[in-house]
UniProtKB/Swiss-Prot annotation:
Assigned GO CC terms: mitochondrial inner membrane; proton-transporting ATP synthase complex
Primary site of residence: mitochondrion
A single MF term (Gene Ontology): ATP hydrolysis activity
Protein name as catalogued: ATP synthase subunit beta, mitochondrial
SUPFAM superfamilies named in the record: C-terminal domain of alpha and beta subunits of F1 ATP synthase (SSF47917), N-terminal domain of alpha and beta subunits of F1 ATP synthase (SSF50615), P-loop containing nucleoside triphosphate hydrolases (SSF52540)
Tree of life domain: Eukaryota
Lineage summary: Eukaryota, Viridiplantae, Streptophyta, Embryophyta, Tracheophyta
Encoding gene (name): ATPB
Provenance organism: Daucus carota
EC top class named in words: translocase
CDD domains per the UniProt record, alphabetical: ATP-synt_F1_beta_C (cd18110), ATP-synt_F1_beta_N (cd18115), F1-ATPase_beta_CD (cd01133)
GO BP: proton motive force-driven mitochondrial ATP synthesis
Reaction equation(s) it catalyzes: ATP + H2O + 4 H(+)(in) = ADP + phosphate + 5 H(+)(out)
Subunit record text: F-type ATPases have 2 components, CF(1) - the catalytic core - and CF(0) - the membrane proton channel. CF(1) has five subunits: alpha(3), beta(3), gamma(1), delta(1), epsilon(1). CF(0) has three main subunits: a, b and c.
Length: 547
């Protein structure tokens, strides 16, 4: 009986509290705030004390400090939305007004980290589905979200050289913020036909085997095929050192944290990246979307790296090198995003927009009248199946392929580029008759030597004809002459790096084909630059070992 009286007393007191006027409780509870309509949240947020204004160097509307008023009717910039559903990396946001367009960046307000959401499709009824660029742990329904009214915007320019940034342009190298007033959105249109340069030019790298047999095109796309420990990283750093006088960008798409850290340290040791007061002399900017990042981050980090490179091309008017490692992980990340958005998969489980996703990025890598972006992309072939949709779609965009061979690496010949498997569209008579004939002559000699190796292994050199013996001797000299010491490897080998001009390279190999240097020992051709160094080394060897 006592318990019944206690319960009825509690109910009467609760009823009286619920009938009190709202002004008697000026501090609403969390439940009241959470259950309010988006319109009331927007009004309350708009009348709150203004937040601190963003720095002048930051792009407008990217700091999550909006006042709740729409500043652009077309994009809905400044509108405040509310998280209504969270499914892993997918976040649904509801707006009472100011619905953002696709690819607009939204920022979660008052969150423990800077969480950027990119708008995907609209779900109707003022709700948009977004992809998170970072982890959504700790995000709750009802959390406020600001419509920035613009795509993801990142810092660009010389301030990014020597720094590591993530997909949204935040520095992750613990060396302070990037101080610049230059920003660009990562979603941009490809250069128009009028702006593009139609003249094809060879991009001289100073690396003999590349320039002679598989030359790169300015503004072209190069596929870099190579396994572990065959010199891929050293080749990348040498290209940065030789070609990119001040501008190169490395985009690690789905990069292992350990690999990214190792590359950063190797670049510092080789002088590609400099710290402290000499940071302005750095030659490379690094953009990482690590393997443990959400798929949205890995799918967009390639665009972030490309945007940094585009600024150097368009504003600085320079030839930029863009390295993407790995291209397959970019496709994989977009496939994950497509599955999260509920799209029906296409062949072999890839997203139905595979060609569009890849083409949108590749078409921005081109030569304009101001400068060029030359892309070197590491290509992974799943199960060695060249008909797989991912590599097959990529091959359609490539202008050259550089294949690193483990067999050549085991011979101690570096760079370990396979001269027979590497190809280029630039190797045509139109690019230079002498260059073309010399390159084809070198490949013919090497192919004949490869065909004779089985006979040599079974019968020996003595059973070969005189012409075949001459072919083998010249091929072995050519094989060793294709080796070259790198500038970035000086600290490991002690040998000074060599840069060989294209004309000197062609003349030297033509001389070997013509038999001008048949009397020189093949050891004198190993790890040198031009033919003059070979002659000098042969004379030195003759003096040291007189016969």
């Amino acid at each position: 009986m006592a318990s019944r009286r206690l319960l009825s007393s509690f109910l009467r007191s609760s009823t009286r509290r619920s009938l009190r006027p709202s002004f008697s409780n000026p501090r609403p509870s969390f439940l009241t705030s959470y259950c309010s309509s988006p319109a009331s949240i927007l009004r309350r947020y708009a009348t709150a004390a203004p937040a601190k204004e963003p720095a002048a160097s930051k792009p407008a509307g990217t700091a999550g400090t909006g006042k709740g008023t729409i500043t652009d009717e077309k994009t809905g910039a400044g509108a405040i939305g509310q998280v209504c559903q969270i499914i892993g990396a997918v976040v649904d946001v509801k707006f009472e007004e100011g619905l953002p367009p696709i690819m607009t960046a939204l920022e979660v307000i008052d969150f423990e980290i800077r969480l950027v959401l990119e708008v995907a499709p609209s779900l109707g009824e003022n709700t948009v589905r977004t992809i998170a660029m970072d982890g959504t742990e700790g995000l709750v329904r009802g959390q406020k979200v600001l419509n920035t009214g613009a795509p993801i915007t990142i810092p660009v320019g010389r301030a990014t050289l020597g720094r590591i940034i993530n997909v949204i342009g935040e520095p992750i190298d613990h060396r302070g913020e990037i101080k610049t007033d230059q920003y660009l959105p990562i979603h941009r249109e490809a250069p128009t036909f009028v702006d593009q340069a139609t003249e094809q030019q060879i991009l001289v790298t100073g690396i003999k085997v590349v320039d002679l047999l598989a030359p790169y095109q300015k503004g072209g796309k190069i596929g870099l095929f190579g396994g572990d420990w065959v010199g891929k990283t050293v080749l990348i750093m040498e290209l940065i050192n030789n070609v990119a006088k001040a501008h190169a960008v490395f985009a690690g798409v789905g990069e292992r944290t350990r690999e990214g850290n190792d590359l950063y340290k190797e670049m510092m040791e080789s002088g590609v990246i400099k710290l402290g007061d000499q940071q302005a002399e750095s030659k490379c900017a690094l953009v990482y979307g690590q393997m443990n990042e959400p798929p949205g981050s890995r799918a967009r980090v390639g665009l972030t790296g490309l945007t940094v490179a585009e600024h150097f091309r368009d504003a600085e008017g320079e030839d930029v090198l863009l390295f993407v490692d790995k291209r397959f992980r970019f496709t994989q990340a977009n496939s994950e995003v497509s599955a999260l958005l509920g799209r029906i998969p296409s062949a072999v489980g890839y997203q139905p927009t595979l060609a569009t996703d890849l083409g949108g990025l590749q078409e921005r890598i081109t030569t304009t009248k101001k400068g060029s972006i030359t892309s070197v992309q590491a290509i992974y072939v799943p199960a060695d199946d060249l008909t797989d949709p991912a590599p097959a779609t990529t091959f359609a965009h490539l202008d050259a392929t550089t294949v690193l061979s483990r067999q050549i690496s085991e011979l101690g010949i570096y760079p370990a580029v396979d001269p027979l498997d590497s190809t280029s569209r630039m190797l045509t008579p139109e690019s230079g008759e002498e260059h073309y004939n010399t390159a084809r002559g070198v490949q013919k000699v090497l192919q004949n030597y490869k065909n004779l190796q089985d006979i040599i292994a079974i019968l020996g050199m003595d059973e070969l004809s005189e012409d075949d013996k001459l072919t083998v001797a010249r091929a072995r000299k050519i094989q060793r002459f294709l080796s070259q010491p790198f500038h970035v490897a000086e600290i490991f080998t002690g040998a000074p790096g060599k840069y060989v001009e294209l004309k000197e390279c062609v003349t030297s190999f033509q001389g070997v084909l013509d038999g001008k240097y048949d009397d020189l020992p093949e050891q004198s051709f190993y790890m040198l630059g031009g033919i003059e160094e070979v002659i000098a080394k042969a004379e030195k060897m003759a003096k040291e070992n007189p016969q």
